[in-house]
């Protein structure tokens, strides 16, 4: 009997210890004792943190007087930093009053069928409530904790997790709402559930279900029937625009950190996409003097940054130096929702930036093929030049901008995106979302069908074959699908050589009509003969249309009836406080097939006079340019037979003594020498380049190639096929060969270098 009693007592003790182990030791979600201690230590020798603390304390003191629910995060942080019970009592009072509400639902959302009981406003309230409850937990009585917990479950936890995750009440799927709303609603509801589980053991199972489901959000592969995009690109990043990508990722990471903090010693599992996010956020940013800018493709603004996600990644153990570099570029307060030093999360989670590198160790170009973005830059230094191209999905936050582009130069988006505004405003659906707000080609005044905002584009756009050889870069945009109601070909090539971006449009439509090129510029626009100069401070570019026609030389366009004429179009500014002008270059002729070639000359200074000289040249089945600048000559050829007009015959042309089937190629050589002796080539979609019975390049399948030879070293950049057997002419055996920045063995025979590649 005695042994039985002892056994029962031991069992009860073990059970009690197990139950205690399952309980959360508040505070432990995000404002942890460890974080508080670390920031106190850093404040002793970091004046910026001291200044930020003063701002936070001031905000908290104002909230203390007003009993401001929306400043629960400030009150919580100040209480945990000072241990002044006055702040904790205010938190308790605010929460006790908050749970008296009948509902935190939104009237418009509740009117939907089925009713949406939760939305972003509720998600934010959930976060604030969780932080406050976690901070003030130990000053509440057990009855107060229970009352608040039950109220918050009714108002937020059950509606959020019930709508987005739990059976049998779930109404959303990843296919219908699997973007930033999903992580915000379910993860903030999950953080709140984490904070309440001591009083409400039943929510623990909900939390664990969310934890198990979160990787599924990152892995969502899209679908065919509803044309939903794959959420995360293989190279990192999310298609929704930087603004919403950062927001959705941030919300997910907040929950993951809170889960880890409340589950010490437990393995959270791997989410492989996280490791690629620092590169993504950096590749779509533009470092400059002043605040960091980022791509504003879709529903984002150029001042939006992703320091919040970067900080949370760093806290999760992704100790990539790129994160430190990125955060160091962000200007305090540069956008509405940031994690800045004088805001609680930024105060606690901004890492020590003293070891941030001057520039990131990243490639200067990046292709995000899954969602159709590409960036190319000449340097990671501030105020460099960056070209960004978009041709991917259209739907929701992703605009009708297939084949559009942005040019940042000398600190300014000198060729810009039209922007966006608040969605209920008619200007959003009538202008900002539509093709007219982007740098694209219209046919008979039409771009992508307007209904794609809601229905999406069944046929998406694509980007292909990015090559980066330093002073020569290339990417191909295929925007045919989104405009296939009018176009059978809508290809746009971007060939960046030295200080000129050449934009080549290959266009064919189902019927005869008129083409126009749209230009959204950010600066003083001045037409000078056949050129347009755009200048903003130290940033200046020349826009020079070369094919199909030059820009009419003067305002007397009737004297140049075949040349491009221009139209000024007024459109709303992003802030909706006024209007701005964008420009359309019209081709007067009515045709159904055209090649467009426009040079964007990147000026070193607004007053630079030594610009490239460009001579238009044509021959049998080809058009092109001869470019002379600073002692170098570049011949650019565009093959008129290689645009799909031939079915089974190959597209051979013979320009200036060359023989090739390439869609386009360029050869560069010092002025005063012969093209035949050139060592630098660009070949676009070609299988051979020959001259005087010599083979300069050969491949059984057509490839995209940049070739540079210098100091007995041959560098090649090649794309186009998974298996490649190619040969390249070199007069002498090179001592070193690199292909796509990787050294390979030198296999050389009779002036031919053999290259074998397998993906």
Give, region by region, the residue ranges found by the protein language model:
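Bacterial Sec-dependent N-terminal signal peptides
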Residues: 1-22
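CBM-like, beta-strand-rich accessory domains located in the C-terminal region of large
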Residues: 19-21, 421-759
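Aromatic-lined, polymer-binding surfaces characteristic
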Residues: 26-44, 48-279
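Active-site-proximal structural scaffolding
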Residues: 118, 122, 182, 245-248, ...
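Flexible, surface-exposed loop/gating regions in the mature catalytic domains
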Residues: 164, 178, 182, 352-353, ...
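Carbohydrate-active enzyme catalytic cores, enriched for enzymes
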Residues: 172, 196, 239, 243-414, ...
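Catalytic Cys-His active-site segments of thiol-dependent hydrolases/isopeptidases
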Residues: 415-420
């Amino acid at each position: 009997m005695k042994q039985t009693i002892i056994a029962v007592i031991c069992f009860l003790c073990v059970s009690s210890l197990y139950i205690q182990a399952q309980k959360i030791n508040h505070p432990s979600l995000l404002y942890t004792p460890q974080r508080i201690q670390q920031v106190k230590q850093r404040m002793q020798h970091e004046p910026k943190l001291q200044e930020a603390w003063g701002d936070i304390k001031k905000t908290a003191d104002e909230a203390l007087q007003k009993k401001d629910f929306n400043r629960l995060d400030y009150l919580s942080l100040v209480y945990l930093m000072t241990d002044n019970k006055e702040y904790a009592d205010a938190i308790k009072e605010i929460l006790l009053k908050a749970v008296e509400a009948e509902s935190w639902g939104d009237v418009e959302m509740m009117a939907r069928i089925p009713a949406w009981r939760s939305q972003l406003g509720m998600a934010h309230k959930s976060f604030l409530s969780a932080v406050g409850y976690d901070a003030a937990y130990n000053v509440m009585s057990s009855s107060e904790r229970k009352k608040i917990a039950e109220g918050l479950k009714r108002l937020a936890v059950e509606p959020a997790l019930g709508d987005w995750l739990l059976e049998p009440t779930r109404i959303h799927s990843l296919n219908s709402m699997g973007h930033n709303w999903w992580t915000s609603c379910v993860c903030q509801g999950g953080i709140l559930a984490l904070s309440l589980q001591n009083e409400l053991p039943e929510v623990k199972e909900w939390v664990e279900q969310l934890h198990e489901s979160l990787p599924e959000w990152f892995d969502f592969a899209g679908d065919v029937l509803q044309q939903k995009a794959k959420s995360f690109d293989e190279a990192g990043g999310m298609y929704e625009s930087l603004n919403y990508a950062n927001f959705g990722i941030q919300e997910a990471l907040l929950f993951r950190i809170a889960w880890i903090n409340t589950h010490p010693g437990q393995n959270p599992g791997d989410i492989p996409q996280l490791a690629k996010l620092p590169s993504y956020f950096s590749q779509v940013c533009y470092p400059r003097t002043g605040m960091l800018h980022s791509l504003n493709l879709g529903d984002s603004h150029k001042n939006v940054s992703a320091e919040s996600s970067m900080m949370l990644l760093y806290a999760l153990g992704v100790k990539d130096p790129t994160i430190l570099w990125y955060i160091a570029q962000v200007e305090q307060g540069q956008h509405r929702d940031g994690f800045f030093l004088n805001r609680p999360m930024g105060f606690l989670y901004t890492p020590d930036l003293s070891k941030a590198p001057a520039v990131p160790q990243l490639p200067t170009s990046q292709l995000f093929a899954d969602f159709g973005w590409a960036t190319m830059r000449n340097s990671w230094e501030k105020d460099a030049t960056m070209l960004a191209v978009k041709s991917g999905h259209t739907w929701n936050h992703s605009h009708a901008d297939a084949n559009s582009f942005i040019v940042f130069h000398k600190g300014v988006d000198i060729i810009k995106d039209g922007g966006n505004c608040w969605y209920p405003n008619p200007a959003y659906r009538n202008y900002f979302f539509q093709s007219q707000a982007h740098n694209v080609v219209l046919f008979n005044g039409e771009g992508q069908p307007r209904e794609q905002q809601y229905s999406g584009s069944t046929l998406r756009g694509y980007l292909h074959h990015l090559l980066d050889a330093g002073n020569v870069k290339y990417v191909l945009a295929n925007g045919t699908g989104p405009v296939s109601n009018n176009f059978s070909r809508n290809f746009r090539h971007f060939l960046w050589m030295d200080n000129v971006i050449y934009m080549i449009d290959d266009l064919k439509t189902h019927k005869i009509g008129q083409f126009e090129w749209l230009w959204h510029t950010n600066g003083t626009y001045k037409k000078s003969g056949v050129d347009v100069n755009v200048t903003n401070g130290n940033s200046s570019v020349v826009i020079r249309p070369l094919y199909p026609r030059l820009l009419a030389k003067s305002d007397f366009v009737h004297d140049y009836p075949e040349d491009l004429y221009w139209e000024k179009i007024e459109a709303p500014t992003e802030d909706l406080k006024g209007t701005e002008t964008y420009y359309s270059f019209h081709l007067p002729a009515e045709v159904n097939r055209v090649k467009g070639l426009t040079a964007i000359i990147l000026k070193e200074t607004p007053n630079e006079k030594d610009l490239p000289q460009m001579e238009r040249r044509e021959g049998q089945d080809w058009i092109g340019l001869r470019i002379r600048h600073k002692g170098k000559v570049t011949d650019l050829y565009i093959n008129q037979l290689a645009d799909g007009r031939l079915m089974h015959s190959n597209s051979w042309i013979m320009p200036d003594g060359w023989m090739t089937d390439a869609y386009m190629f360029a050869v560069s050589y010092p002025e005063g020498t012969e093209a035949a002796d050139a060592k630098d080539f660009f070949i676009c979609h070609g299988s051979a380049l020959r001259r005087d019975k010599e083979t300069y390049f050969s491949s059984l399948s057509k490839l995209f190639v940049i070739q540079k030879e210098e100091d007995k070293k041959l560098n090649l950049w090649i794309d186009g096929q998974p298996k490649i057997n190619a040969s390249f002419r070199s007069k002498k055996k090179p001592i070193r060969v690199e292909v796509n920045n990787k050294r390979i063995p030198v296999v050389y025979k009779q002036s031919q270098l053999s290259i074998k590649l397998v993906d």
